[in-house]
Design a protein with these regions (language model features):
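Cytochrome P450 core scaffold surrounding the K-helix E-X-X-R motif
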Residues: 467-471
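Active-site "cap" helix and flanking loop/linker of ATP-utilizing ligase/carboxylase catalytic domains
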Residues: 473, 477-509
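Generic long, charged, amphipathic alpha-helical segments
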Residues: 364, 514-530
Length: 539
């Protein structure tokens, strides 16, 4: 039996056995990001704190296990109903596996994903069986199989050093991070990259350096999971800020308010933030709750975060929408973007009705497919409302040209209106003074209030700068879900692995919060378009 690689230390050891013989070592990915002189500024800082941090694996725990149904359709093609995060990606991979382009994919309603359904799992098995037998096939994983197969949130080990002046102003941060990406790459490289690009936090300082290494081990694979690596490095940065506030003698709220990025300032990655940046507003929104809790003597926890929208870092990121006026006299919305529970269909319909003279009854949202709907990339990276939404607006503008000319929907039957938006960004290391890493960021401040007698979480307040809230109720739902998931991650969820690198937990023992165990959650949607009176910014 070959020796197993159980952890990051074994994977990175000299002369370690290789998980893949064709690789020279166990390094899946390496990233180095540097701006300014972090080491120099830290050496001159009045206050310096260094700490080691670790975060565990966690399971997505989506309600619906992976499932695919396939059959031969009337055109002789292998037709796949799939619950995944990109119908077009499934199409490409199944075509490669079968050696034919006679494949169609349509998304069924997806019972949750959170990144756990980005990798193909059962679709190709169903497609292959149908291709060989010419019979309908359904492949659905049991819960135990699902827990074993799909990638998890990465285990991280991190060493961070932060330097601040006497007023708590950050002068520099230097870090090294190591991730266990398991026995397959999955999205280990992109997750590491996102962790590194966001590790500096949403603050105004210019001296930052980070090295990141993702290692192959024989553990279950790790990949995309809500936050995509940002949650891990955010935990380290925010923990250091709390320690720094204690050392300097100011409150956790005050140290964040002093350092918070503001419009026109420059993030540690060099990107200049615009007027839509609302981190300060999220801090101000939770301040009354914070002050009230402190006055009552209740223990509180506070944290800020930023997260990209869109793929960014120079990678092509395109949204596409096709509007077709059908024989029924209605406008049908076709987009290749999977709707996995975040409400994309609702958002596109809202955008359609809000930016045309049509009523809700005039519009039909069609599920993502690969033969009519144009490819809009994966439903991941908080990108679909922004990227595909902008494509929808552009298609609406073309449709309205015909409407303004006096045409009725009956006269427009059969017409197709196509919208496309490419989010242009700069690659990592671009030789420009102020690279655009991402077309947009979201900012948030979270406040946790404990019961001073029991130590249990009593109240969570989450203030999120979301840009334009297309559907505020849906935004609140996403915030509440994120809070619950993060509470489990921070407090009690676990995904232990035995000495043979095999997971040993069942769904019921993962440590998920039950509904009756949850605290009060207040979701504050910070929409700066409603706070500042200004012309809306179009992409």
């Amino acid at each position: 039996m070959l020796p197993a690689i159980h952890n990051i230390q074994e994977a990175g050891a000299a002369n370690a056995p290789r998980v893949f013989d064709e690789e020279k070592d166990n390094v899946c990915a390496y990233k180095h990001i540097s701006r300014g002189d972090a080491a120099g500024e830290i050496s001159k800082a009045k206050h310096v704190i260094s700490r080691h941090f670790e975060t565990p694996w966690t399971e997505h725990a989506f309600l619906e296990p992976e499932c695919a149904v396939s059959y031969i359709d009337q055109d002789g093609d292998v037709f796949i109903y799939s619950t995944d995060q990109s119908a077009h990606q499934t199409l490409h991979e199944c075509c490669m596996a079968l050696g034919t382009d006679k494949v169609k994919v349509q998304n069924a309603l997806v019972g949750g994903g959170f990144g756990g359904k980005e990798d193909m799992t059962v679709q190709h098995h169903a497609a292959l069986l149908t291709y060989v037998t010419r019979r309908p096939v359904k492949v659905k994983l049991t819960r135990a199989e699902s827990l074993l197969v799909h990638p998890k949130r990465h285990h991280f080990e991190m060493d961070f050093t932060m330097g601040c002046d006497e007023n708590g102003i950050i002068k520099g941060v230097k870090a090294k991070v190591y991730t266990d990406t398991g026995a397959f790459a999955s999205l280990g490289g992109p997750v590491l990259e996102r962790a590194c690009t966001h590790a500096a936090g949403p603050y105004n300082y210019q001296n930052f350096e980070i090295e990141g290494t993702a290692y192959y081990t024989n553990n279950p694979p790790a990949g995309a999971f809500r936050g995509f690596g940002v949650t891990q490095t955010c935990f380290a940065t925010e923990s250091l800020l709390n320690m720094m506030a204690d050392e300097i003698g100011i409150t956790p709220w005050e140290i964040r308010y002093r350092n918070a990025i503001r419009p026109g300032q420059v993030l540690p990655n060099g990107q200049i933030v615009d007027e839509s940046t609302g981190l300060v507003e999220t801090l101000e929104a939770i301040k009354p709750y914070y002050d009230e809790a402190i006055a009552a003597g209740k223990p509180v926890g506070l944290g800020c975060a930023m997260k990209n929208a869109g793929v960014g870092v120079g990678i092509p990121d395109t949204g596409r929408v096709k509007l077709i006026v059908g024989d029924d006299g209605k406008v049908h919305i076709f987009s290749g973007a999977s709707c996995i529970g975040q409400g994309l269909g609702t958002v596109l319909v809202q955008m359609m009705v809000s930016n045309t003279d049509l009523t809700r009854d005039d519009v039909v949202y069609e599920r993502s497919n690969t033969w009519i709907s144009p490819d809009s990339g994966t439903t991941s990276g908080s990108r679909q409302t922004l990227i595909t939404g902008e494509a929808c607006l552009r298609a609406c503008e073309k449709l309205m040209e015909d409407r303004r000319s006096g045409l009725s929907l009956q006269q427009m039957k059969g017409r197709v209106y196509y919208g496309e938006y490419l989010a242009k960004t700069d690659p990592l290391g671009a030789d420009v003074p102020n690279p655009v890493s991402h077309v947009a960021y979201g900012y948030a401040t979270q406040l946790c209030i404990l019961d001073k007698k029991t130590g249990r979480v009593e109240h969570m307040i989450a203030a999120h700068d979301v840009g334009k809230a297309v559907n505020p109720l849906s935004c609140e739902g996403q915030i509440e879900g994120g809070v619950v998931m993060s509470m489990g991650y921070a407090l009690r969820e676990k995904y232990p692995i035995d000495d043979n690198c095999k997971p040993i937990e069942k769904y019921g023992s993962l440590g998920l919060f039950r509904a009756h165990e949850l605290p009060e959650i207040t979701a504050l949607v910070i929409d700066l378009s409603l706070i500042h009176i200004s012309e809306p910014t179009r992409l």
